[in-house]
Regions:
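Acidic, PIN/NYN-like endoribonuclease modules and their adjacent C-terminal/linker elements
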Residues: 1-4, 109-110, 114-139
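A generic structural signal for short hydrophobic patches within well-formed alpha-helices
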Residues: 12, 47, 127-128
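Short active-site oxyanion
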Residues: 36-40, 75-77, 116-118
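Short beta-strand scaffold positions
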Residues: 7, 41-42, 80, 103, ...
Length: 139
């Protein structure tokens, strides 16, 4: 059985944007996961969210298109969200009260459950509150 981590859009955005406050952490976290033999799988929605965030919120269209081209080239391991994941994500989302946590975060969480992933590649503390493990910060 493979060792798995599920990637969130914020991890991917941090890797792509050298000015992101989590850029160095993202580099270290992804290197740590890969060196430990983990595969990082992204829900297809996380790829879409990262592309949108880079283009719209961060005004980095070149980075958005870079991620898109990498997706097209098959550079990412992708888990396409099925009905079960989406339904469970909608149930998890109903329990959230913070406006910072979106349905996309719930999809990442439920993808991690579905795949029995050990880690989530993200910097969002909400996942810790939901009982998931993030990559250790002291690596």
């Amino acid at each position: 059985m493979n060792k798995l981590a599920v990637g969130d859009a914020d991890g991917l955005v941090a890797l792509a944007d050298e000015q992101d406050s989590n850029h160095l952490k993202a580099q270290k976290a992804s290197e740590w996961l890969l060196n430990k033999g983990y595969e990082i799988i992204f829900p297809n929605t996380a790829i879409l969210e990262a592309i949108t965030a880079l283009k719209r919120a961060k005004n980095l269209p070149d980075k958005a298109h870079l991620i898109n081209r990498q997706y097209q080239a098959g550079a990412f391991l992708i888990e396409f969200v099925n009905d079960q994941i989406q339904h469970r994500a909608s149930q998890r989302f109903e329990k959230t009260v913070s406006k910072k946590n979106t349905i996309f975060d719930a999809v990442v969480a439920e993808t991690a459950v579905e795949l029995n992933a050990e880690y989530i590649f993200s910097f969002d503390g909400w996942y810790l509150k939901e009982g998931f493990k993030l990559v250790p910060e002291n690596i």
